[in-house]
Curated annotation (Swiss-Prot):
Keywords: Cytoplasm, Glycosyltransferase, Purine salvage, Transferase. One of its GO terms (biological process) is AMP salvage. Pfam families: Pribosyltran. It catalyses: AMP + diphosphate = 5-phospho-alpha-D-ribose 1-diphosphate + adenine. This is Adenine phosphoribosyltransferase. It comes from Mycolicibacterium vanbaalenii (strain DSM 7251 / JCM 13017 / BCRC 16820 / KCTC 9966 / NRRL B-24157 / PYR-1). The gene is apt.
Amino acid sequence: MTDIADVIRSLMREVPDFPEPGVHFKDLTPVLADARGLAEVSKAIADAARGADLVAGVDARGFLLGGAVAVTLGIGVLAVRKGGKLPPPVIGATYTLEYGTATLEVPAEGIELAGRSVVVIDDVLATGGTLAATHQLLTRAGANVTGAVVMMELAALGGRAALEPLEVTSLYTA
């Protein structure tokens, strides 16, 4: 059995001093661009997401992972979009960034979310703001959010605590 954390670690690119001096940026793009990497990450996320009847992929790399996982599980995928990208009406949630705010949205019509078991998928858990906003807007739409699955967690930023009591699964922790 392959350890998924080893797969991610072996394919991930580390970029020193980006986006600013002293930061070691962990670029997951090579993991997703590698056929084996994408397949193994998708399978590991799908294993963690079993039992949901809808995947919510968060803009933007959550779309890639969410689509692959939904196909694997034989369920649908919902794109959780950045604000202003969907036609009205929408259900949105605003969250705080380091220098301002951002909004995430899902359609308010055309997709029945009430009572559905939804798992949220994203590439990285950092401060937890994006996933918390996603959880909030899906819950407001009536969905039962069963958990969140991320490819990588930046543990030092404390995002997991911001999401309690939501169950969070991370494939790789940095």
